[in-house]
Amino acid sequence: MNTRRALAFIFCTVTLDVLALGVMIPVLPTLVLGFMGGDTASAAEMFGLFATAWGLMQFLCSPLLGALSDRYGRRPVILISCLGLGLDYIFMAIAPSLTLLFVGRIISGITAATISTAFAYIADVTPPDGRAKAFGLVGMAFGLGFVVGPALGGLLGGLDPRLPFWLSAAACLANAAFGWFVLPESLPPERRMAFAWKRANPVGSLNLLRSQRPLLGLAAIDFIVNVAHQVLPSVFVLYAGYRYGWSETTVGLTLAFVGFCAALVQGLVVG
């Protein structure tokens, strides 16, 4: 296997997936606000439910997809996740009601296993002393996607609030097609594990953390960081529009700066 080429594809995959997510951040709250009749308070509560549903589906389904990647390999899980996200964004682009838009976020949470599987892929193909640097590069890709994504989403959302969803769909589907031809499998058959439901559920994953105290501490830190991080996209767009009258473009450019800072830290500090 050409490790450099494989890591380059994983870098591009993470960048495109986060870009596809980022382009929606400036416009999805606006769509919810429209469905709620312009009531900012109700829209904020509903968008919070959107974010909760997405996170809950990830919590429930990520262990399952992780166990499937241990059994069948990383490649099919990554490609199916990219394909599923692309189809989901098309569904959200044409959703005529708030209910169907909510269903779209649930589907997105179910299929959003690309990032975690990408980290498993990196662990498969890099030596232990090089993993911190490789993980740092993936973190930089994450930040890069959040630089370009919100900026594009804000600019396109000013033209049509549905347009960023079509761009997200195109990015994910193109990435899935590209990966079909260039992404090799990283987990050889002799290293694969039998599928077991005790590992393929959130409770099993939490039991694993409990048995490894260093991992438990890191997981607690990551949980706190993500709680703080998820507050920003959940309320910032609506708050900035209500308090300061910011447009989708202004919000998108502001969040792009946040993504730039994240990419800088991940790329230069980690590893």
Q: Where do the protein language model's features map onto the residues?
A:
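Pair of pore-lining "gating" transmembrane helices in MFS-fold secondary transporters
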Residues: 3-30, 34, 212-232
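Hydrophobic core of transmembrane alpha-helices in multi-pass small-molecule transporters
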Residues: 15, 88, 99-113
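Short amphipathic helix-loop junctions that connect adjacent transmembrane helices
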Residues: 27-44, 234-250
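Central cavity-lining transmembrane alpha-helices of secondary-active solute carriers
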Residues: 49-65, 256-267
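Conserved MFS/SLC helix-loop-helix module at the cytosolic interface between two early adjacent transmembrane helices
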Residues: 59-98
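Cytoplasmic helix-loop-helix junction between adjacent transmembrane helices
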Residues: 104-143
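Helix-loop-helix hairpin linking two adjacent transmembrane segments in secondary transporters
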Residues: 141-181
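Juxtamembrane intracellular "pre-TM" segments in multi-pass secondary transporters
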Residues: 184-221
